[in-house]
Regions:
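Transmembrane alpha-helix entry/boundary detector in multi-pass membrane proteins
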Residues: 797-801
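Alpha-helical transmembrane segments of multi-pass integral membrane proteins
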Residues: 770-785, 810-811
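Generic alpha-helical transmembrane segments
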Residues: 733, 737, 778-779, 802-817
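HAD-like small-molecule phosphatases
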Residues: 765, 769
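Conserved cytosolic headpiece of P-type ATPases
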Residues: 1-755, 760-763, 776, 790-791, ...
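Long hydrophobic segments that form regular secondary structure
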Residues: 787, 792-796
Length: 902
C-alpha cells in the first residue's frame, strides 16, 4: 500500500479503526467463488446416467450368479464397462474444468485510490470496505458499488452489467436519467469509467454488490435435464422392460414346464428330495438373469461418453471450449437462442461509420487543404481520449470515451498524428462534455494560422444552433437555411442506430476573451459537418443468423439498449423485417415485467427483441420459453447475462466476457464469434445422429443375442455364445464401433433440418425398422446355422461353435459400415479413404477377432480356423454390406429421378 502527501480533499475518509469495524461488519471485497464439487462427487455424478444405472442392476444379478458358479468373468466385464464409461466422462470434464480455471483467472490485487485518514492511498481492490471514499479516474474499473459524491463529466461503461456502453453519471438530481437501469448517482462494481472523474462512497462490497448478486444467481443449481439424458432415460426404461419381460416370461415358461408339471410335489419328502426342484429353479433363474445381462447394451454409455468426449476435444479446435460435456449434444437440440447485443452481435467497438464534412470535396477523406487541417486539429485538441501505442502489425487501441477514441482512430487512418497536433496546439480554455451542455469546447492557440481557434463538438442540433454559417466546399451558407438538410441526414443516421456528432469552429480575435462559455454563447460559429458513429455488427453475424434460422432456430435479442437501437441491429442482422414484424414482436424489459405469466407465455415465442432488459427479465424469459417446451441457449459476455446463462439448457459465454458470465456458462466461445454458435449446433446435431447410428448398430446385436440365447434355451442346445464372447462383442468391439461412429465429421446438411422435438424418442421409426428388419434376418441365418450344426455329424462341437461365433461377429462387423451411413443414401465407402480412424478401427476389430479365434482357447471357447474357413466366413457375411449398398443405390436413383421431375 502506498500513501501520498496530504491533499486538499474535503473528504477525510475512514480511520484505521473504522476500516476494521466496517470489514468485520460488512465483509471483504471479494466475490465468493462458485462452490466446486469435490472430485469424488464429480465422479459419482457420472452414475446418474440412466443406462449406467441399468448396468449396475445387471451387475448385481451377475454377481449373484458368479458367487453361485464361482465364475466372475461376466461380473468383472460389466463392472469394467461401468468404470470405463464413468471414468472417461469424469476425466474429460475435470480436464475442461482445469482449462477453464486458467482461462478465468482474475486479479484481485489491482491498486485503487481511496481517501483514508485524510490522505489519498493506493490499496488492493480486495481491501476496500463499506464507507471508503474511492477516487474514480478515466480508464479505471469501479471496484465496488457506491454513491457518487462528485461527478465531473463522468461517463461509465455499464455494458457488462446492463448492456449500455456509455452512461452519464451525475450528482445533480434534476439531471437523472429516469430510464436508466441504475440511478444516475450510483456506480457499480465491474463497470468502467470511460470519461471524466469523480469520487464515491462505497455502499456495498463483495457478494452484496450488484455483480455479486448476479454471480450468486448464476451459480444456483439448475436441475433441468438435458435432451439426451431424457432420451437415454426412455431408452434405458425400454431396454429394462424388454429384458425383464423376456427374462420373466422365459423363467415362467420353463418353471411351469420343467418344475410345476414335472415334479409330483405331494410325494416329495425331506430336503434331499426337494433339492432337484431347487437346482432346476435356480438354473432357470440364472438363465433369466443371463437374458437380462445380454439385453443390456454394455457399450452404450461408453459410446455416448466417448462421442461426447471426442466432440468436446474437436469443438475446442473450432474455438468452442466446452466445460460441461452434455452441452456438446444439447446444442444440437436447441430451438431458441437468446442473445445479448453488445459484444455478441456487435463488436463493442465504436467506429466512425460515415464522416460528412461539408467543406471538403468528398466529405469523408482529409487532405492537406485548410479545412481538412482545421478538422484534424479540432478532433485532436478537442478530446480527452488517447491511443495506446500498438505493436507492429496490430491495430491501435484507445483509452477514454469510446466515441472520442473512434474519432482518433479515424484520424489515424487518415494519416494524421493526433498527438503531434494536440501537443502543438496550446490549450487556453476547455469545457468538458456534460449532459447539461451536450457539447465539448476547447480554445487553442493554433500554430496552423497563428491565431486562437475555438473548436466545438457535440449533439449536432445543439452545435448547429450555435452556428451562424455552414462551411461548404468553396462557399458558406446561412446555418438556418441549411438546418433542414442537416436534420434529414441526422434522421437517416438515427434510423440506422448510429450516434451522431456535429463539429464547428471559430477563429477568435486577439481582443476576445479566453473563455469558452462566453465565446460559444455568441452563436457565431462555423458548422463543419456531422459524423455518424456506430458499434458495428460483427461481419459474420448476418450469415450466422441466417444459418440458425434455416435450421429452425428462433433468435431473440435481449439487450439493455434503447428500442430503436435494438430494432435497427435486429434489422441489420436479418432478424427484423419492418414490413412483417409488429409491436407484438418486441417489448421493453419494464413492459415485460408488468405482464402476468399467462400474458408473457402467450407472447414469448413471438418476441424477437427485448430492449432495456434487466438481468431478471432475461432469466424470466428463459424460464418461460422452457415452460413452452423450448430448448434454450443463451449467449452473452456480461455479468448481466450470468443468471440466464446458468438457467438455460446451454449457456454460451464469450472468451473476452466477464469471469462471472464464463463461470455460469456451459461453452465459452474463445473467438467471441456468433458464427461459432452455428458451428456448435452443427456439431451437436451431427453428434446426435452419430449416437443414433451407434444405437442402431448396438441394439441390432442385442436383439439378435437376446433371442439367440432365449431360443437356444428353448431348443435345448448348448449356449451358442459364452459370457466372454458376449463381452468381446458387447464391450470391446462396441467401443471400437463407438470410436468409429463418433469420429464421423459433422455434416452441413443437418443445418437444413428443423430441430428435433424434445418429446421425440431417440429410436426413430426408421431405426426401429432397421433394427428389427436386419436383426430378424441375422436371427434366421444364425438359427439356421444352429439347426444345421445340431443335426450334423459333429454336432455343436468347439469347431462349429467357433465358426458360429466368428460368423456372428462378422455379421456385426459388416453392419458397422451400414450403420456409418444410416439415415443417408450415401455409399458406405464414401469418404472412407480420408477417414483414417475408421480404417484403423476396422483393422483393430479384424485383428482382435483373429487373435481370439486363433489363440483364445478355453477362455473364449474357440479353436483355430484355417484360412479357407476364414475367407468363406468373411465372404458370406459381407453379403450384409452389399445388400445395404444395393438398397442405397436404388434410393439414390429414385431421389435423383424425383429431383429431375421437380
Amino acid at each position: 500500500m502506498s500513501t501520498t502527501k496530504k491533499d486538499d480533499y474535503y473528504h477525510v475518509g475512514l480511520t484505521d479503526d473504522e476500516v476494521l469495524q466496517s470489514r468485520e461488519k460488512n465483509g471483504i471485497n471479494l466475490l465468493t467463488p462458485p462452490k466446486r464439487p469435490s472430485l469424488w462427487k464429480l465422479y459419482l455424478e457420472k452414475f446418474e446416467d440412466p443406462v449406467v444405472r441399468v448396468l449396475l442392476v445387471a451387475a448385481v444379478f451377475s454377481l449373484i450368479i458368479s458367487i453361485i458358479e464361482n465364475e466372475y468373468a461376466e461380473t468383472i466385464g460389466i463392472i469394467a464397462a461401468i468404470l470405463l464409461a464413468t471414468g472417461i466422462g469424469f476425466f474429460f470434464e475435470y480436464d475442461a474444468s482445469k482449462k477453464f480455471d486458467l482461462l478465468n483467472a482474475v486479479n484481485e490485487e489491482t491498486l485503487v485510490k481511496v481517501i483514508r485518514n485524510g490522505r489519498v492511498q493506493e490499496i488492493p481492490r480486495k481491501d476496500i470496505v463499506v464507507g471508503d471514499i474511492v477516487i474514480l479516474e478515466t480508464g479505471e474499473e469501479i471496484p465496488a458499488d457506491g454513491e457518487l459524491l462528485e461527478a465531473i463529466s463522468l461517463q461509465v461503461n455499464e455494458s457488462n452489467l446492463t448492456g449500455e456502453p456509455v452512461i452519464n453519471k451525475t450528482t445533480v438530481e434534476a439531471d437523472f436519467d429516469e430510464e436508466a437501469t441504475y440511478a444516475s448517482n450510483l456506480v457499480m462494481r465491474g463497470t468502467t469509467v470511460v470519461d471524466g472523474h469523480g469520487t464515491m462512497r462505497v455502499l456495498h462490497v463483495g457478494d452484496a454488490t450488484e455483480i455479486g448478486k448476479v454471480a450468486r444467481q448464476s451459480t444456483e443449481d439448475n436441475l433441468e435435464p438435458t435432451p439426451l439424458n431424457i432420451q437415454l432415460t426412455k431408452l434405458a426404461n425400454l431396454i429394462g422392460k424388454i429384458g425383464f419381460t423376456v427374462a420373466g416370461l422365459a423363467f415362467l415358461i420353463f418353471f411351469v414346464k420343467d418344475v410345476l408339471l414335472f415334479f409330483d410335489f405331494g410325494s416329495l419328502n425331506g430336503w434331499h428330495e426337494w433339492l432337484p426342484v431347487f437346482e432346476r429353479t435356480l438354473k432357470y433363474f440364472m438363465m433369466a438373469v443371463t437374458l437380462i445381462v445380454v439385453a443390456v447394451p454394455e457399450g452404450l454409455p461408453m459410446s455416448v461418453t466417448l462421442s461426447l468426449a471426442l466432440n468436446m476435444r474437436r469443438m475446442l479446435s473450432t474455438n468452442n471450449l466446452v466445460r460441461k460435456m452434455h452441452a456438446c449434444e444439447t446444442m444440437g437440440a436447441i430451438t431458441v437462442i437468446c442473445t445479448d447485443k453488445t459484444g455478441t452481435l456487435t463488436q463493442n467497438l465504436m467506429q466512425v461509420h460515415e464522416p460528412n464534412f461539408y467543406g471538403i470535396k468528398n466529405g469523408s477523406v482529409l487532405s492537406d487543404d485548410d479545412i481538412s487541417t482545421l478538422i484534424a486539429e479540432g478532433i485532436s485538441a478537442n478530446s480527452t481520449a488517447f491511443l495506446e501505442e500498438a505493436a507492429t502489425g496490430e491495430k491501435p487501441k484507445g483509452v477514454g470515451n469510446p466515441t472520442e477514441v473512434a474519432l482518433l482512430l479515424w484520424l489515424n487512418k487518415q494519416g494524421k498524428n493526433y498527438l503531434e497536433l494536440r501537443e502543438k496546439a496550446q490549450i487556453l480554455d476547455q469545457l468538458t462534455f456534460s449532459t447539461e451542455r451536450k457539447f465539448m469546447a476547447t480554445l487553442v492557440d493554433s500554430p496552423l494560422i497563428g491565431k486562437k481557434i475555438l473548436y466545438i463538438k457535440g449533439a449536432p442540433e445543439i452545435v448547429l444552433g450555435k452556428c451562424k454559417e455552414v462551411v461548404l466546399d468553396g462557399r458558406r451558407v446561412d446555418a438556418v437555411e441549411y438546418r433542414s438538410t442537416v436534420e434529414a441526414q441526422l434522421l437517416g443516421y438515427q434510423n440506422m442506430a448510429m450516434r451522431t456528432l456535429g463539429f464547428a469552429f471559430k477563429i477568435v480575435g486577439e481582443n476576445e476573451p479566453n473563455d469558452c462559455t462566453e465565446l460559444v454563447s455568441a452563436n457565431d460559429l462555423n458548422f463543419l459537418g456531422v459524423v455518424a458513429i456506430s458499434d458495428p455488427i460483427r461481419p459474420d453475424v448476418p450469415a450466422a443468423v441466417a444459418k440458425c434460422q434455416s435450421a429452425g432456430i428462433g433468435i431473440k435479442i435481449v439487450t439493455g439498449d434503447t428500442p430503436g437501437t435494438a430494432t435497427e441491429i435486429a434489422r441489420q442482422i436479418g432478424l427484423w423485417n419492418p414490413e412483417t414484424d409488429t409491436e407484438r414482436n418486441r417489448i421493453t424489459g419494464v413492459a415485460f415485467a408488468e405482464l402476468s405469466d399467462e400474458e408473457a407465455l402467450d407472447r414469448v415465442m413471438d418476441l424477437k427483441i427485448m430492449s432495456r432488459a434487466r438481468p431478471t427479465d432475461k432469466q424470466r424469459l428463459v424460464q418461460l420459453l422452457q415452460q413452452k417446451g423450448a430448448v434454450v441457449a443463451v449467449t452473452g459476455d456480461g455479468t448481466n447475462d450470468a443468471p440466464a446463462l446458468n438457467h438455460a439448457q446451454v449457456g454460451l459465454s464469450m472468451g473476452t466476457g466477464t469471469s462471472v458470465a464464463k463461470e455460469a456458462s456451459d461453452i465459452t466461445l474463445l473467438d467471441d464469434s456468433f458464427n461459432s454458435i452455428g458451428t456448435a449446433v452443427m456439431w451437436g446435431r451431427s453428434l446426435y445422429k452419430n449416437i443414433q447410428r451407434f444405437i442402431v448398430f448396438q441394439l441390432t446385436i442385442n436383439f439378435v443375442a437376446l433371442l439367440i440365447v432365449l431360443l437356444g434355451s428353448v431348443i435345448g442346445t448348448e449356449l451358442p455364445l459364452t459370457v466372454t464372447q458376449m463381452l468381446w462383442v458387447n464391450l470391446i468391439m462396441d467401443t471400437f464401433a463407438a470410436l468409429a461412429l463418433a469420429s464421423i465429421p459433422p455434416s452441413e446438411t443437418v443445418m437444413l433440418e428443423k430441430p428435433r422435438r424434445s418429446t421425440d424418442f431417440i429410436i426413430s421409426k426408421a431405426m426401429q425398422s432397421n433394427i428389427l428388419g436386419v436383426g430378424s434376418i441375422f436371427l434366421i441365418v444364425l438359427l439356421g446355422m444352429i439347426y444345421y450344426f445340431d443335426h450334423s455329424t459333429e454336432g455343436m462341437d468347439i469347431h462349429n461353435l467357433t465358426i458360429f461365433f466368428t460368423f456372428f461377429v462378422m455379421l456385426q462387423f459388416w453392419n458397422l459400415f451400414n450403420a456409418r451411413v444410416f439415415g443417408t443414401t450415401d455409399s458406405a465407402f464414401k469418404g472412407l479413404s480420408k477417414s483414417y480412424g475408421m480404417e484403423l478401427i476396422v483393422l483393430a476389430i479384424l485383428a482382435g477377432q483373429f487373435l481370439i479365434v486363433q489363440f483364445g482357447g478355453a477362455v473364449f471357447r474357440t479353436e483355430p480356423l484355417n484360412w479357407q474357413t476364414w475367407l468363406l466366413i468373411i465372404g458370406v457375411s459381407s453379403t450384409v454390406l452389399w445388400v445395404g449398398e444395393l438398397i442405397r443405390l436404388v434410393q439414390r436413383i429414385i431421389h435423383k429421378k424425383n429431383r429431375n421431375e421437380k
